[in-house]
Amino acid sequence: MKFAVFLIATGIALAQSVVTNLADAKWTHDKGDPPGSESVFLREDAQTGGMELLVRFPAGHVIAPHWHSVNERVILAEGKLSVRVGTGAEKVLEPGGFAFLPAKEVQRLSCVSNTRCTFYIHWDGKLDNHKVQ
């Protein structure tokens, strides 16, 4: 009981559960992205501002080089996603593939399959986006 009282006293908000399947997700079109791109907002951490989304991009879509001030994690659900971080080699993820993209590292992602790419993204803090020229 002391633990519960401590949580209330410190004002820590308890997280809400999120349980969904791809087939049940409510997809919305992303403004500013190519036709056919969609996302599903899953949750945001009230304390860190971190977010989790499902994202779909059409075949051939390239996400231009950019970086974030926070770490990013990607898990590919369908398609083939090319990932390049910093000056490292390009790696193609297949379904089930995982990428950890460190904060402030330039990243470039592209859907290199003949079908759309669907993936989960988690940012561990408030999202910002810095384009690289």
What name fits each language-model region?
Residues M1-L7:
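Sec-dependent signal peptide recognition
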Residues L7-A15:
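Hydrophobic h-region of N-terminal signal peptides that target proteins for export
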Residues L14-M51, V132-Q133:
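A short, N-terminal "cap"/entry segment at the start of jelly-roll beta-barrel domains
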Residues Q47, P58-G60, K80, K104, ...:
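Solvent-exposed coil/turn segments that connect beta secondary-structure elements
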Residues Q47, T87-K104:
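Short acidic-glycine-tyrosine-enriched beta hairpin
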Residues M51-H68, P102-K104:
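Conserved short histidine dyad/triad with adjacent acidic residue
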Residues P58-H61, H68-G86:
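Glycine- and acidic-residue-biased ligand/ion/polar-headgroup-sensing regions
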Residues A103-L127:
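Ligand-binding loop in jelly-roll beta-barrel domains
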